[in-house]
Amino acid sequence: SEGSNTWIYDHRSKKNTFRKIKGAKLRLTNDYDTNTYQPLKLRNSTRQIIPTVGFNPDDGMKLGFNATNTFYGLRQNPYTTQHNYNAAYYFATNGFELGYKGEFAHIFENWNLELAARFTSPNFSINFFGIGNETENFDDTLEMDYNRVKIQHLNFSPSLIWRGQLGAKLRTGISLESLEVEETEDRFVNTFYQTNGEENRNSFIGVDAEYNFENLDKAAFPTMGMTTGLLIGYKASLENQGQAYAYIVPSLSFDHKLVSNGRLVLASKWKAHFNLGDEYEFYQAASIGGIDGLRGFRNQRFSGKTSYYQNTDLRYNLKSLKTGLLPVTLGVYGGFDYGRVWTPNEDSDLWHTSYGGGFFLNGADVMTARLALFNSLDGPRFSFGVGFGF
């Protein structure tokens, strides 16, 4: 029979006979799920939009969204296509960022194609306090802007993704990125550039591979599970010949309920970052701070060649509530962090610590809200956020 829009799938490794398939397209694959008739595997699409609202001293108020469109067709791994769009605006700096990530199933047998892109405005900001484990914080006298760095970032990253049946994921790809730092007067970064003679604009090409394994009983508030990851990569400057470095970032986290009903959970995370070679920019250093490691400090508070931290939380589910939109659970948690960075030619035995806690809301494992207050030698740090995940 004729049918220009008809696809015929069958096993590549088996003997097949096809008759009268004029106009149809033939695709042979050994993928079991594709070749097996599954009447309950329907073609459908889902759309999800989650607002992101938050606050921390570095960003001020944050408003944004995370939108995901997923299509389930004949060939799924675990879906046929998925497009994710995200955007955020930061009121303290008037900066914004835009992101896109698309995934397309079975580009090569069980491998998916991922396309990712990111853009930040010229006044999007990160922090920089210098290189070293004992850098000083002058917020009390010079205010927070002194260590803010305005940086524009453009990134495009195509990758291949393989997923295992039990929660494993392997991604490998290349990246092209361009970054421009504004040498703002009366800020620490301007002094750093003048002292070190650094270039404020750079473009990089990179290759990386990342392995992740996740096995959690719940996505937003896990009571039992483990997550592990390993990222290995290499980046080279397109402008400065010989400027290149490699990096290794391992991580491991556990969630374990301490009572049978899962209301009391112990959670811990370990993460390290190793830069191999010395030819990296300050924004490529191994950094720890409020959003990655030490919740009582400012973002990117300490930067070095190597970093390590551990977070440990004790979480308690106080009460379950029924609302007109989603069933929600209210909980409280306390946490302790420790970590440090290492830099060549620095003799430091100091380990930084922070401690605190807060409240969280979990809405049907779809959306969470968090309010936290952590303390450190730099003083207290308050933050809250609404989004997905703990």
Feature locations, PLM:
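Transmembrane beta-barrel strands of outer-membrane/channel proteins
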Residues: 51-55, 83-89, 102, 113-131, ...
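Outer-membrane beta-barrel "beta-signal"
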Residues: 208, 361, 379-390
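C-terminal outer-membrane beta-barrel translocator/porin domains of Gram-negative envelope proteins
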Residues: 99-102, 128-129, 140-146, 193-200, ...
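Flexible, solvent-exposed coil segments and beta strand-coil junctions
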Residues: 41-47, 75-83, 133-142, 184-195, ...
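A subset of solvent-exposed loop/turn segments in beta-rich extracellular surface proteins, enriched
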Residues: 71-96, 104-154, 174-190
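Sequence/structural signature of outer-membrane beta-barrel proteins
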Residues: 70-74, 86-92, 120-124, 179-181, ...
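Strand-connecting loop/turn motifs
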Residues: 60, 108-112, 165-167, 225, ...
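Outer-membrane beta-barrel initiation region
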Residues: 2-114, 121, 198-223, 306, ...
